[in-house]
UniProtKB/Swiss-Prot annotation:
It comes from Rhizobium meliloti (strain 1021). The gene is queC. GO terms for biological process: queuosine biosynthetic process. NCBIfam families: 7-cyano-7-deazaguanine synthase QueC (TIGR00364). Catalyzes the ATP-dependent conversion of 7-carboxy-7-deazaguanine (CDG) to 7-cyano-7-deazaguanine (preQ(0)). CDD domains: QueC-like. Keywords: ATP-binding, Ligase, Metal-binding, Nucleotide-binding, Plasmid, Queuosine biosynthesis, Zinc. GO terms for molecular function: ATP binding; ligase activity, forming carbon-nitrogen bonds; zinc ion binding. The lineage of its organism: Bacteria, Pseudomonadati, Pseudomonadota, Alphaproteobacteria, Hyphomicrobiales. This is 7-cyano-7-deazaguanine synthase.
Amino acid sequence: MKTIVICSGGLDSVSLAHKVAAEQELSGLLSFDYGQRHRKELDFAAACARRLGVPHQIIDIREIGRRLTGSALTDEVDVPDGHYAEETMKATVVPNRNAIMLAIAFGVAAARKADAVATAVHGGDHFIYPDCRPGFIDAFQAMQDHALDGYADVALYAPFVNVSKADIVADGARHDTPFAETWSCYKGGARHCGRCGTCVERREAFHLAGVPDPTEYDDPDFWVAATGSFVAEEVK
C-alpha cells in the first residue's frame, strides 16, 4: 500500500513513519508549518525523511494558524505544565488542526495516486483532543469517501488510535526508531523541558514500555509527581 505519512517530527509520527517503511510502501512524509512555537520539530521530520530515503514536503499554513487564536501552541499563551489528562491541557488545543491537515493530506494523496494517508493519533490524545478520537477518524474517512468519490480511493491509516503512547514506544523500538531523533516538547527550547504535557507523557511512555529514554530533559524527574494521580488507562 503506497502511503503518505503526516509527520510532525514527534515521537509518534516518526515511529509511524518507520512502521510504514517496514510494513508498507512509504511514498513520502508530509509536514505542516502552522506557526507552532515548537517549529523545530519540523527539522526532525526532515531528518526522518532523509534517513528513510523518501521525499519530504512542508506545507505552509501559517496564515491559517494565525486565525486559530487562543492556543498555547500558536498564540501568546503559556504552555501549561503537568499531565495530559489535566483540564489545563486544553490550552494546547488548536481548533480543527487535524481536520485541516488531513484534508490537505488527502488532496495530496489523491493527486499523487497514493493509497493511504497515515496519522499517528493515539489513545493518550483522546482526553484532550477531539480530532484524535476513533469517532473522528471514522467520520473523516466517511467524509473523504464522499469528497473523492469517483476520483480516488484513499484510506486513512491510524494504527495507534486505540493504543497508548507506551505501545507506540514499544512498536517504535521494534522498528528501530531512533527516539533521540524525535522532538516532543511544546515549549520549543534547546532541550525538552520535562514539564509540559507532552514531555511528561513522553517520559511516562518510555517508563511504561520498559524502553530506555535517550531524551535530555531540563527537569527529568517532574514526570513522577505529574503522573502520580493518573494511570495510562485513564487517559486512553
